[in-house]
């Protein structure tokens, strides 16, 4: 763990780096902004979800992937238990097609192409916004399947309000968090720390094809994190907002060779950091300017046989300038530019270890009576592969006060990673500097309703991805643009109150087809065709009861869909309860995987069985 949490002290001493949140008197930050990059949007077209702090605590979730799995169109695969490598898929795309932001700053590895969502501490999160569908016209590369934006905890009521939690559970699992939030006048802040540890489970199952590789041990996980977020609004309307989040983690994993002679005592030490700052001001009554700067790090050292084995570090710096022109309440024109540099460091010698990208975007949003329009264009220029243009068009029509019809079209792309382009050549693997960006084209239509009894929505979509980058061949294996995928799906959701119980359910039907010549018509790897989620909650005075059901159909671990790669469908049931001692104190208990179901999301990797967790929470009023 090479970074120190003492960085908080540096930030506390640099108020000039604390920059801006969108907002009207510091309130606009509570609105969804990811779908449009604006605090005020006259239309609502994108298929999206919001997970609030209250929901995070009610669900008693232990990780970000656990929270995301209960959403329509989102699926999770994991290489073992808590803290192990985890992939999040939106609408059948890969984890490399999902853009992850923390307080507006892009995070993730520039070598692997994915973000370590399993290492983002839930105790430091205020809310999560999830947008399904392409958003490259606003954000550029990676936003093919969707965008996940995580916002750290922010200030609360006037004065200083401490909070803390402590938990314990199965497999010697322990967690704790503490912080203080508050505000005074036009300023606010939130400062917190959190830690967790677990002995975990045996990450990898016994394989008859490699019996000597079996390592029957518990693969544990430890994490220590801290965050700081603060903001101030001056009398002249200038708003400053800044945040810092850092998570240090240690994760054991199984990596013994087929002969059993090497790869023992394998573990990784990782560090994730995101620093963001924004300033917002209005030169004219209709013109809002937002300046943002950010820095993120994804660092990882791997060890085998108790010795250093490999290092893959990513450091990203970014800046953006956005201008929002508000023509009344019904029209917003946004013009902006983004600049980003990626730098990698590895024990391997890459041909290139840095690159930059410039992006220019324009977006128009308008509401005309019962009609809504959202249109965007973006031009990106990458240092290595050149220019790329993307666009989007959305339309909504209010059939009545309760029913809205939506339609959307968008193009997107994903730039090749440093591994794709420059992975050092060996007898087994080598990068390919000629590989091109992946491209996609997506269509969507939806209908949603809001009534006295609740709300519901139905969305149907098709996404076609071309020039998929696949590592193929042998001696060495190299990445090539060879594959095509066509993903069709229907997502449904209903939320209501039934017999006094709050009910929230969603059902996803998906046909994630591989359209390449070799595997035409097969399911994409590790994608399920059907998923169902059901949440039930009810309050009985001071006692709250809840239950969650998650079910998924079979999936295949190999692109060929051969029988020996089939992973059966499964269903999981969780129970939870909460007792309020008073308005400040709560006792919580959760029983996960009630029926102790054995299942896999990645072949040969185990998943946790039945587990019991207890938590006590305090929040000063």
Give residue spans per PLM region:
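N-terminal periplasmic "start-of-domain" segments of outer-membrane beta-barrel proteins
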Residues: 28-59, 87, 95
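Extracytoplasmic beta-strand/coil segments of soluble accessory domains associated
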Residues: 65-105, 109
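Periplasmic-side early beta-strands and strand-to-turn transitions of outer-membrane beta-barrels
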Residues: 136-137, 149, 155-159, 163-167, ...
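Outer-membrane beta-barrel signature, preferentially recognizing the C-terminal barrel domain
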Residues: 259-282, 312-315, 383-384, 398, ...
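Gram-negative outer-membrane beta-barrel transporters
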Residues: 329, 333, 367-370, 460-464, ...
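Outer-membrane beta-barrel "beta-signal"
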Residues: 446-448, 608-621
């Amino acid at each position: 763990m090479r970074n120190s949490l003492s960085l908080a002290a540096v930030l506390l001493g640099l108020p000039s780096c604390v920059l801006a949140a969108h907002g009207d008197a510091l309130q606009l930050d509570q609105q969804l902004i990811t779908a449009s990059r604006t605090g005020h949007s006259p239309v609502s077209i994108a298929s999206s979800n919001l997970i609030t702090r209250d929901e995070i605590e009610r669900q008693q979730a232990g990780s970000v992937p656990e929270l995301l799995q209960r959403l329509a169109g989102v699926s999770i695969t994991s290489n073992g238990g808590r803290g192990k490598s985890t992939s999040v898929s939106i609408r059948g795309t890969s984890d490399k097609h999902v853009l992850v932001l923390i307080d507006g700053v892009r995070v993730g590895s520039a070598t692997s192409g994915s973000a370590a969502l399993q290492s983002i501490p839930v105790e430091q999160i205020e809310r999560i916004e999830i947008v399904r569908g392409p958003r490259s016209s606003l954000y550029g590369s990676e936003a093919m399947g969707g965008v996940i934006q995580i916002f750290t905890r922010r200030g609360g009521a006037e004065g200083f309000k401490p909070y803390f939690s402590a938990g314990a559970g199965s497999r010697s699992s322990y967690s704790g968090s503490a912080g203080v939030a508050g505000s005074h006048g036009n300023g606010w802040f939130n400062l917190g720390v959190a830690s967790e540890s677990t002995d975990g489970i045996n990450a990898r199952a016994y394989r008859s094809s490699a019996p000597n590789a079996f390592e029957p041990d518990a693969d544990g996980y430890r994490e220590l994190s801290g965050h700081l977020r603060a903001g101030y609004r001056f009398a002249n309307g200038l708003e400053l907002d800044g945040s810092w989040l850092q998570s240090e983690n240690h994760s054991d994993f199984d990596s013994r060779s087929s002969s059993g002679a090497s790869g023992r005592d394998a573990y990784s030490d990782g560090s994730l950091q995101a620093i963001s700052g924004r300033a917002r001001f209005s030169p004219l009554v209709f013109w809002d300017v937002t300046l943002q700067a950010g820095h993120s790090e994804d660092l990882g050292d791997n060890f085998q046989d108790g010795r250093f084995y490999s290092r893959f570090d990513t450091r990203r710096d970014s800046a953006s300038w956005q201008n929002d022109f508000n023509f009344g309440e019904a029209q917003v024109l946004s013009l902006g530019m983004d600049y980003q540099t990626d730098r990698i460091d590895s024990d391997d010698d890459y041909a290139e270890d840095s690159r930059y990208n410039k992006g220019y975007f324009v977006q128009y949003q308008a509401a005309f009576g019962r009609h809504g329009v959202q249109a965007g264009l973006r031009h990106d220029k990458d240092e290595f592969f050149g220019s790329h243009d993307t666009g989007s068009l959305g339309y909504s029509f209010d059939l009545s006060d309760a029913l809205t019809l939506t339609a959307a079209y968008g193009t997107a792309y994903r730039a090749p990673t440093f591994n794709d382009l420059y992975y050092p050549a060996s007898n087994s693997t080598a990068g390919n500097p000629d590989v091109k960006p992946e491209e996609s084209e997506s269509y969507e239509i939806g209908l949603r309703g809001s009534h006295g009894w609740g709300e519901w929505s139905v969305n149907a979509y098709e996404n076609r991805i071309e020039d998929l980058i696949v590592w193929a061949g042998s001696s060495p294996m190299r990445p090539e643009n060879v594959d095509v995928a066509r993903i069709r799906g229907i997502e449904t959701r209903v939320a209501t109150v039934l017999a006094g119980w709050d009910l929230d359910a969603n059902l996803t039907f998906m046909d994630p087809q591989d359209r390449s010549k070799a595997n035409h018509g097969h399911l994409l790897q590790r994608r399920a065709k059907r998923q169902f989620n059901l949440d039930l909650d009810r309050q009985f005075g001071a006692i709250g009861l809840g239950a969650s059901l998650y079910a998924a159909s079979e999936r295949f671990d190999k692109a060929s869909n051969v029988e020996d790669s089939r992973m059966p469908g499964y269903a999981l049931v969780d129970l939870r309860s909460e007792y309020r001692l008073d308005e400040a104190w709560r006792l919580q208990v959760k029983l996960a995987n009630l029926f102790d179901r054995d299942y896999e999301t990645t072949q040969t990797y185990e998943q946790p069985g039945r587990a019991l967790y207890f938590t006590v929470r305090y929040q000063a009023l």
